[in-house]
Design a protein with these regions (language model features):
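Residue-level detector of functionally special positions within alpha-helical transmembrane segments
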Residues: 4, 81-83, 127, 132
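Glycine-rich, charge-decorated loop segments at or immediately adjacent to ligand/cofactor-binding or catalytic sites
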Residues: 5-21
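Active-site neighborhood of phospho(di)ester-bond hydrolases with catalytic His/Asp-centered motifs
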Residues: 1-4, 25
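Extracellular S/T/G-rich loop segment that most often corresponds to the catalytic His/Ser-adjacent loop
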Residues: 17-98, 102, 135-136
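C-terminal subdomain of the subtilisin-like protease fold in secreted/lumenal serine endopeptidases
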Residues: 98-138
Length: 138
């Protein structure tokens, strides 16, 4: 689930990301610019821990300046936010499960954490770090 865009203060992860049962994804790159003008405030990604002291988000992924779908004629537009970061992790996990089909979800989650670029100084606020897809699927 996406962490939400209400950061950077602690305890700003939104529902459903606060649930113990979901993997919550934050955006690693918080500044968004359009024609040189900042359009999203610095630190928009929701941060943990939750009110129950759960580390959230667990993992970070790129979420700024992502080409996505649009209702316009072109069919595409550039978007930013944790909702753009979450599909990066979903896709990476799909590749990893394809390579390691015998892994349980818990085993894959641990592999994801162990192979992330660490940012341990802020573990409770931003999780285990930035996703490293290459290391995840090796």
């Amino acid at each position: 689930a996406a962490a939400g865009n209400n950061g950077p203060k602690e305890n700003t992860v939104t529902i459903p990301g606060i649930s113990r049962k979901v993997l919550t994804v934050g955006s690693s790159d918080d500044d968004t610019y359009d024609r040189g003008r900042k359009v999203l405030k610095t630190g928009y990604s929701g941060r943990g821990p939750t009110a129950c002291c759960i580390v959230k988000p667990e993992i970070l992924a790129p979420g700024t300046g992502i080409t996505s779908c649009s209702k316009d004629k072109s069919g595409y537009q550039v978007k930013s936010g944790t909702s753009m970061a979450a599909p990066v992790v979903s896709g990476a996990l799909a590749l990893a499960f394809e390579k390691y089909p015998s892994f349980t979800p818990a085993e894959m989650k641990l592999r994801l954490y162990e192979r992330a670029y660490p940012r341990s100084a802020q573990l409770g606020r931003i999780g285990w770090g930035m996703i490293h897809v290459d290391h995840l699927v090796r």
